[in-house]
Amino acid sequence: MKMSQQCRWPGKWSAFALFFSSALLSSPGFSQASLPASIQAENYSHMSGVQLEATSDSGGGQNVGWIEANDWMAYSSNPVTIPTTGAYDVEYRVASQAGGGSIRLEEAGGATNYGTITVPNTGGWQTWTTIKQRVNLTAGTHSFGIAIPAGGFNLNWFRITAVASSSSSSSSSVGWARLPAIKQSGAQWVNAANNQRVDLRGTNIGNWLIQEFWMMGGIMAHNGGTINDQCTLESVMSQRFGNAEKERLMKVFRDHYITTRDFDMMKAMGMNVIRIPFLYSLIEDEYNPYNVRPDAWQYLDWAINEAEKRGMYTILDLHGAVGGQAAASEQHDGCIGAAQLWTNANYWDRTKWLWDMIAQRYNGRSAVAAYDLLNEPWGTDATTLANRSYELFNVVRAKDASHIILLPGHNSGIDAYGNPNSRGLTNVATWMHFYPGLWGWNDTATYGAGQANMHANWLHCNSTATNPAGTGESCDWRNRINGIQTPFLVGEFQPWTLLGSYGGQMTRKTYDIYNSYGWAATNWAWKTTSSGGSNGDTSSWAWGMITNSSNGGGMSGINVSSASAAQIETWFRQFSTQPLVRNESIAYWMNWKAQTGQRIEAEMFKDHSGIRMETTTDTGGGFNAGSTDDNDWMSYPINIPTAGNYTLDVRVSSPYAGGTLVLSRNGADLGVVTVPNTGGWQNWQTATITVNLQAGQQDLAIFVRKGGWNINWWQLTKQ
């Protein structure tokens, strides 16, 4: 029996250890190590269960041996100063005859668990190797301890070194301007530096850091049929090639599916925020739980940086938690099957640990707009979701005091949260995913015009003289969000794929309306691919803003049960070089702005009161603005290049006479148009007057002095 066995507390630290750790750290003049910090294992301040022996490792001296489960060593006499919060590598010099042991790094006393690493079979008790784990540490003085979940090895020393991190909020070490942080102000997302509203409009990079195989046309298969979830793909590759080769192939996919050209194209299509869905095992070592992977932050860091270089924020979206959070039939959380996150205590604890790691990593990183705690958590009830989400909120807030944290919406809504502000929370937001026209939401509306009008009704609601702001449809959500004074994200929406030729303009209008409410919005999704690709015809477009081109970008399917590792690698590599095409209608409308000398579509107002939009039969198609009642209005930011007289043409229709349209600025009339009886709501005429305008950037408004007419477009031409 070991001499110290009589005074052991199995699996726990002693009260003496806790006292001794505190006493040493508070002693005047006590020396503290700076990084890199190497600590000889035998230099513990106190221990339980271990013994020392001479070592034949390089450098000589002693090693700690006779290590068994529940032993521990505390190093309170060797405190280490961590200069900044972030990632650090911890190396352990170990030897083992059989392997299977494990080391858990903790704060002395066990207050904080930094993760566990497995000790391999090194070939003998004095055959030494160095193993490494990556941990996140907070700035300050640490007194570390080593706990032993499983023994059977010797330990000579351990060493802590800093990892070069791209998560610093400083601009001095990067070649681009840092974005200002975003914070909550009531129901608004605002620039933390000047408190001005930030209109976030972006996309989701789906199928990259968590795969959804329908987004690649469903052309990946195995011997059991089509691959529908990432778990199936990884399982087949692991069984055939081993875990290490599977991991290498997954890295090839991630390196090639999204590249810098994607970020260039996102910026060119008017995006300023990118939601990044990821699977838990991108960060946590699935083979060694409670440990971050050696490459844990590679892809998130890279994406945050590439987005910020182009002036775009990021939202970090845990799309797939360990065990799965979605309903059993869903594949988007990584694995089809029961949502075990809600019933497995270990999975839930690991998810809290994961968010602790993320919060430590990106604390102070201003380019991260928000943390999205869980995507589409349909596998539980709304009350359980709310309670668990508040748990995650507290985990994150303990390590990151400033980032906005998104409380996930349930498929029944957000009411279970109550009002987050009543809990004294700050920088908290909520989200929902709105998919008009899909999955039972008016999905019988006809393709094209029918879908376009259904989307238009959702966006513009109903207004009356006593309630010009409107009720019904999206207005009810706006009123609910304003009532709780909490920012809101429409985390997913799809405004083009069923709308045909109307899709590009409806995409822009959706962003405009959501932003006018103060909401952020990210469409689903950035990219999809298919076997044949697209010839660029925007009247028939899939779910991605971009896709592979039919001109040289077609793809054949692959069976991963029979393809070689080299063939799978080649298939994955094609994504970085295949020709891509973007939806040019979306690109045009996302960059459209009102200008003199060309038609200004009336429905493309920035703000409005009481107006609706609908498809039009006028020449050129598209939409018109209508449902005009007295005192309604529409406003348009526009730059007038030179002062002087301009011809104002307005394209109007009405079954009545006596309507009055006023072009105004700051409430002052610039010109008045009397709208004639054109013979019907879709019988169009052009009315013309002259107006005098000042030069410069300004907001011009079309004011409805007397309603009962539609307007398709208007145009200002310098005389």
Predicted segments with their positions:
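N-terminal secretory signal peptides that target proteins for export/translocation
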Residues: 1-10
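Bacterial N-terminal signal peptides
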Residues: 14-26
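Sec/Tat signal peptide C-region and signal peptidase I cleavage site
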Residues: 27-31
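Extracytoplasmic
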Residues: 32-166, 172-175, 592-719
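Active-site mouth of glycoside hydrolases
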Residues: 179-192, 197-200, 205-404, 409-417
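Extracellular glycoside hydrolase catalytic/binding regions
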Residues: 181-182, 343-519, 539
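Glycan-binding loop/region signatures in secreted carbohydrate-active enzymes
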Residues: 204-255, 429-431, 436-476, 481, ...
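Aromatic-rich peripheral "rim/lid" segments of glycoside hydrolase catalytic domains that contact
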Residues: 502-595
